[in-house]
């Protein structure tokens, strides 16, 4: 796994250039004519939000990359990170159109039976998934181009 100092340095580097842009715009504001200050202030607000979202997205993505590069088995992660690492497995098992062990030649028409067979297959293979190397998909940190509180909460909950 990446060393704490390396992770901290990457986060600090990203924050530094973003903060420098905000300071530059604040310095420009001081020299703008009074009748144009509102335009610069609006630009500052937009840039501030943009950097807030960008930094948040970068930090979460960097966290995911650090976990993925650590080559840690899923069984050694916290429960929440186990769920995140198994994101694609869960998606696969939600697919009721996929044939499986119990209905290899075709699926029954009954949805409840399809769900039951998919769940049973998952339970039978669960212990095998735990020995896989964790690979959390980037989409877990998707800010949906709008970092409203619900989106931030969702990402924090998943990681």
What are the language-model segments listed below?
Residues 1-46, 61-63, 69-70, 74-84:
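Charged alpha-helical initiation segments
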Residues 48, 60-159:
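Helix-loop junctions and short alpha-helical segments
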Residues 50-54:
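Extended alpha-helical coiled-coil scaffold domains characteristic of the BAR superfamily
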């Amino acid at each position: 796994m990446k060393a704490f100092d390396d992770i901290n340095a990457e986060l600090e580097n990203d924050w530094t250039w973003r903060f420098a842009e905000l300071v530059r715009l604040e310095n420009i504001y001081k020299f703008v004519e009074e009748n144009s200050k509102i335009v610069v202030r609006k630009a500052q607000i937009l840039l501030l939000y943009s950097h807030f979202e960008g930094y948040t997205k970068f930090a979460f993505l960097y966290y995911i990359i650090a976990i993925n590069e650590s080559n840690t088995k899923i069984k050694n992660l916290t429960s929440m990170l186990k769920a995140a690492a198994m994101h694609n497995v869960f998606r696969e098992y939600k697919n009721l159109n996929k044939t499986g062990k119990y209905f290899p030649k075709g699926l029954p028409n009954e949805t409840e039976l399809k769900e039951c067979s998919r769940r049973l297959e998952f339970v039978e293979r669960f212990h095998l998934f735990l020995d896989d190397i964790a690979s959390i998909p980037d989409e877990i940190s998707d800010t949906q181009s709008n970092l409203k509180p619900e989106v931030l909460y969702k990402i924090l909950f998943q990681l």
